[in-house]
């Protein structure tokens, strides 16, 4: 019982669901069903739960391609909790990831421009930062698993990006 997760789980079951049963292999299914039923009701909507705990601000993380229409709707609504977004450009720098060129095409559409060079990529990201800022974003969030370092020149970076856009392999 030294793991705080044990205590947090029981605290949250009691605080949010009025469930005081001990969670174990015998009670798990009953607790699952009870919480599932409550979460499907209007009283347990995300908004209601946030208001119940007196949340003042909630931050989400959004990709630069996100149109932010949900955030715009929340700003116009009567929801009392401030919902802000954080700009999360991870996919724009993960050049070795599957689907990278498709992602860059999506980013180009979101920025209303073609991305054919590294400069274009930087310009598209700047445009999206301005768009996010216009929509109240003041934070940036990065979720990279690892940060690699190689000493590349600017011309090498441009060349690697161009080769990737052309579908050619290049050393990373």
Segments (PLM) and residue ranges:
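Metal-cofactor-binding active-site regions of metalloenzymes
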Residues: 1-172
């Amino acid at each position: 019982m030294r793991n705080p997760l044990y205590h947090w789980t029981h605290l949250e079951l009691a605080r949010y669901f009025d469930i005081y049963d001990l969670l174990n292999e015998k009670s798990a299914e009953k607790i699952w069903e009870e919480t599932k039923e409550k979460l499907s009701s209007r009283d347990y909507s995300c908004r209601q739960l946030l208001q119940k705990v007196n949340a003042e601000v909630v931050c989400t993380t959004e990709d630069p391609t996100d149109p932010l229409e949900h955030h715009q709707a929340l700003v116009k609504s009567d929801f009392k909790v401030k919902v802000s977004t954080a700009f999360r450009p991870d996919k724009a720098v993960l050049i070795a990831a599957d689907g990278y060129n498709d992602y860059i095409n999506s980013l180009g559409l979101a920025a209303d421009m073609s991305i054919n060079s590294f400069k274009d990529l930087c310009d598209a990201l700047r445009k999206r930062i301005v768009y996010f800022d216009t929509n109240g974003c003041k934070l940036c969030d990065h979720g990279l698993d690892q940060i690699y370092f190689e000493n590349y020149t600017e011309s090498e970076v441009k060349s690697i990006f161009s080769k990737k856009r052309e579908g050619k392999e290049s050393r990373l």
